[in-house]
A protein has these predicted regions:
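A substrate-engagement module of RecA-like helicase motors
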Residues: 2-20, 26, 75-78, 83-218, ...
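Walker A/P-loop
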Residues: 44-66
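Signature of the SF2 helicase/ATPase Hel1-core->accessory helical subdomain module
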Residues: 64, 70, 90, 94-98, ...
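Conserved RecA-like ASCE P-loop NTPase motor core of nucleic-acid helicases/translocases
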Residues: 78-87, 456-460, 535-542, 669-670
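A contiguous, basic/glycine-rich beta-loop/short-helix subdomain that forms a polymer-engagement track
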Residues: 185-218, 228-237, 366-506, 512, ...
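Conserved interdomain hinge at the start of the Helicase C-terminal
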Residues: 446, 503-542
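Conserved RecA-like P-loop NTPase helicase motor core
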Residues: 503-513, 566-675
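Conserved helicase motor "Helicase C" RecA-like lobe of SF1/SF2 P-loop NTPases
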Residues: 542-566
């Protein structure tokens, strides 16, 4: 279906009305171009899918929402906007869509967050009531759930009052209370512990209320993992053919798909025996007390016992084999080269895939039967068995998927990375089996590209090394299939607004002298901090080890640093804003996750410090397997794997500085390999064009000296061209 004149007119009218709603709105050519490109794709005018890189400042969210809503209304489809993190998801839901509602009459939208973001009203009721007053409530719960203290009970009672009075929608991110993870893990629930329609609280449950709203919404804001799960299970979202799909932060999609397909499970023989015995007893209880309408042959005691015994014997054999492969020690790991399993292990995996799938099917059958008996049995006893069977189903689902994936030699034309680990838990050794495909393009083709007619993939960073090649290889999007790849210009003048500083340090950030390099970095940072020229600063590290070593060199500054892990990220950012707005200096210190989604403009962030070029870890089983596979194809892993990933990370880190026309400042990168290695120029060429300075290191760094304040050295003049350095 081609874009109609009415749709074009509607898009233009809404865009014009938007300019009147936003103070100091600046019309931008890249934004108009993006609106046009998105409209052509979603309207079916041009190509299959669109990958469009929209640099910071383009206004990409409104650029896809306006044409997306116009086309969705005309074609009576649902616009699904998917993001990679909760912060952006909530921004679109709480800020961008309410803004558009002012110019788009009767706009209906909702958000679909993961189950774990919502409070479970059943758990909340238990935790908000003191144990003496709970009465029969706990009888509905399989696990004892009582408040740990009077203070905790009062906090939960306040949450319950807000939920009951509709002041709170049950979403963790929408309460003004700071709820620590330990409490939230008890307030929320997961699929295995949810009674679904059989729960007394089902009708008012925030999670299910939100799911029901999806059916009436024109726009649904979700996340990548939820979208993939929904398309795979054909639930939650409308049929793919009735969707318009926008994948914001689309560079995360291959990783999210890989994470969703990664399977790990405890395969320790004692643990397996425990799970099988519990399931056998549960099946016997169902047969005796709840009389299923149909009795599966596998549920007879003798057959089920023999079936479970075969599972146990195979797992025990697997334990013996991998036990010989694992290095000695409490914590150890063994990776199967190229993901190739010994023949005996492969045969065990294939057999276990069939056996555990049979157990999964049996659990599902009993669960469905139990769900239909709520009116004819003791509700307390039934609910307990329902919960136990639901958990058994989750266990065997995971086992079945694990052994099925382990049985595959290849997925998406590449090996499946497989490894085993030994861990000690509560003093007992446990063996875990892990599988993950190193390519997921076939799965994405099957779930998304082939099912949804038109998809827009967008992000401020889709390319690495000025190329879409890595995205194409990892996602399966390709020119030959009619997919288009577009790059928009940045609306900012980076050369005038900022500069890139690469200090002349003695050491490169290599492992053999990491500590010496970090000592130099700390001294340079200290000198910059003491100058007081920048109120808002950000320091980014490639690893937690490096971050902690750096902090050990600046103990006197530690109280003034807001370090990742000290508090939740949103709280650290709030404190940072408050300090800078009060005229104080503030420094955020974090890892790569702080290089994404951090939008601090003007004085809030005017100096970014980057520890080093962040190459991916070389000891990850997935990375090592991918490297082996690339070498077998006569491809150079550094070129295909490491360098594109490093370029991508660096672009994101550098992108924290210039967020608006009023932003200014400098980016300090403590890695001279950008200037001394052949690949350095390629990494620099993929960045926005900045003036480049190479200041001398402070004197205290060049030769040992008595302890004193490090003095700032002379700075060189800015480079006038990209490849000219001072």
């Amino acid at each position: 279906m081609a874009l109609t004149a009415a749709q074009k007119s509607q898009i233009a009218a809404w865009y014009k009305a938007l300019q009147q709603q936003i103070p100091d709105f600046i019309p931008r050519a890249p934004q108009r171009q993006m609106i046009a490109e998105v409209a052509k794709t979603l309207g079916g005018d041009e190509g299959r899918h669109l990958a469009i890189e929209a640099p910071t400042g383009v206004g990409k969210t409104l650029s896809y929402l306006i044409p997306g809503i116009a086309i969705a209304r005309e074609e009576q489809k649902t616009l699904v906007v998917s993001t990679a993190n909760v912060a952006l998801q909530d921004q679109i839901f709480s800020k961008d869509l309410p803004l558009l509602r002012k110019i788009i009459p009767e706009l209906r939208f909702t958000a679909a967050f993961g189950r774990g973001r919502y409070v479970c009203p059943r758990n909340l009721a238990a935790l908000s009531t003191d144990s003496a007053s709970q009465g029969d409530l706990l009888a509905f719960l399989d696990d004892e759930l009582t408040p740990n203290s009077k203070e905790e009970q009062q906090r939960c009672a306040k949450l319950k009052a807000d939920l009951d009075s509709y002041k709170w929608d049950g979403l963790r991110d929408h309460t003004d209370q700071a709820i620590e993870d330990s409490l939230w893990s008890r307030l929320s629930t997961d699929k295995a512990s949810c009674l679904n329609r059989n729960c007394h609280y089902y009708r008012e449950c925030p999670f299910f209320v939100a799911r029901r709203e999806i059916q009436e919404a024109e726009v649904v804001v979700a996340n990548h993992a939820l979208v993939m799960a929904a398309l795979e299970s054909e639930s939650v979202l409308p049929e793919p053919k009735h969707l318009l799909l926008v994948l914001d932060e689309g560079h995360h999609l291959p990783d999210v798909a890989r994470d969703a397909l990664e399977m790990s499970a405890d395969i320790s023989a004692p643990w397996t025996r425990l799970q099988l015995d519990l399931f056998s007893k549960l099946v016997a209880t169902c047969r005796e007390q709840f009389r299923p309408k149909t009795v599966p042959p596998l549920s007879t005691p003798e057959r089920l016992n023999n079936h479970c015994e075969e599972v146990y014997e195979l797992v025990a054999t697997m334990n013996r084999i991998v036990g010989l492969l694992l290095p000695p020690g409490e914590e150890s790991e063994f990776r199967f080269p190229m993901g190739e399993l010994p023949q005996e292990v492969m045969e065990i995996c294939e057999r276990l895939a069939k056996l555990t799938e049979n157990l999964r099917g049996l659990a599902e059958l009993f669960l469905n039967d139990l769900s239909e008996k709520t009116g004819s049995h003791d509700i307390v006893r039934l609910h307990r068995v329902l919960l136990q069977m639901n958990r058994a189903l989750g266990h065997f689902e995971a086992q079945s998927k694990l052994w099925r994936l382990a049985s595959l030699a290849h997925a998406s034309g590449a090996p499946v990375s497989k490894w085993v680990t030994r861990e000690t838990r509560e003093g007992q050794p446990h063996i875990f089996f892990h599988c993950v495909g190193i390519r997921v393009s076939d799965q994405l083709e099957k779930l998304i590209w082939r099912q949804v007619p038109h998809v827009v993939v967008t992000s401020a960073t889709l390319r690495s090394l000025n190329s879409f090649a890595r995205l194409q290889e990892m996602s399966g999007l390709r020119d030959k299939a009619g997919d288009r790849f577009v790059t928009l210009d940045s609306p900012f003048n980076h050369f005038e607004q900022g500069k890139l500083v690469i200090p002349r340090l003695r050491h490169e950030p290599l492992m053999e002298h990491e500590e010496a390099h970090l000592a130099e970095m700390a001294a340079y940072f200290r000198a910059e901090y003491k100058k007081g020229e920048h109120k808002g600063m950000l320091v980014l590290f490639a690893s937690n080890r490096a971050m902690q070593t750096f902090l050990s060199f600046v103990p006197d500054l530690r109280l003034g640093l807001l370090v990742q892990g000290d508090q939740p990220r949103y709280r650290l950012v709030e404190l940072h804003r408050k300090k800078v707005e009060q005229g104080e200096a503030s420094v955020l210190v974090g890892l790569q996750s702080f290089a994404e989604g951090l939008d601090l403009k003007g004085e809030l962030l005017s100096q970014v410090h980057i520890h080093k070029i962040a190459f991916p870890p070389v000891d990850s089983p997935v990375v090592v397997t991918e490297g082996e596979w690339l070498k077998s194809l006569k491809r150079y892993p550094f070129e295909v794997q490491s360098l594109p990933a490093a370029s991508f990370n660096l672009i994101q880190q550098v992108g924290r500085l210039i967020r608006s026309h009023s932003c200014w400042g400098e980016i300090v990168i403590y890695d001279r390999r950008l200037l001394t290695k052949s690949y350095g120029k390629r990494l620099l060429d993929a960045l926005p064009v900045f003036a480049i300075e190479q200041p001398e290191a402070p004197e205290a760094l060049i030769k040992p000296a008595p302890a004193k304040r490090a003095a700032a050295g002379r700075k060189g003049a800015p480079a006038r061209r990209r490849n000219t350095y001072r």
